[in-house]
């Protein structure tokens, strides 16, 4: 059975999360506090481990609220949204 469309949109990988934090100069502790996700889960996710869809969504939402844009054009990536861009 195929994944629901909304879940597919949420798929990000741990390398993207670590890169996004780097762009934002965000410490892991700040991401942990903002998402309510445990330290062990964030560490596992950034190291390439799997997480539940709700965890992925929480992490993605926090980073997107701070200006991160997740890209998947060929290879997963991240970029910082320009302040003057209309998305």
Predicted regions located by residue number:
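N-terminal flexible/basic segments that precede or flank functional cores
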Residues: 1-8, 69-87
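Short, conserved glycine- and acidic-residue-centered signature motifs
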Residues: 10-14, 24, 52
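Short basic helix-loop element that most often maps to the first helix and adjoining turn
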Residues: 16-30
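Conserved hydrophobic/aromatic packing and binding residues within compact polymer-binding modules
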Residues: 17, 31-32, 42-45
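Alpha-helical residues within the helix-turn-helix
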Residues: 22, 33, 47
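Recognition helix of helix-turn-helix/homeodomain-like DNA-binding domains
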Residues: 36-51
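DNA major-groove recognition helix of helix-turn-helix/homeodomain DNA-binding modules
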Residues: 53-71
């Amino acid at each position: 059975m195929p994944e629901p469309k909304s879940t597919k949109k949420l798929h990000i990988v741990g390398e993207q999360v670590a890169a996004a934090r780097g762009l934002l100069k965000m410490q892991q502790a700040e991401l942990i506090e903002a998402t309510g996700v445990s330290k062990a889960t964030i560490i596992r996710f950034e190291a390439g481990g799997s997480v539940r869809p709700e965890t992925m969504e929480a992490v993605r939402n926090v980073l997107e609220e701070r200006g991160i844009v997740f890209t998947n054009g060929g290879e997963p990536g991240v970029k910082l949204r320009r302040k003057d861009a209309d998305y």
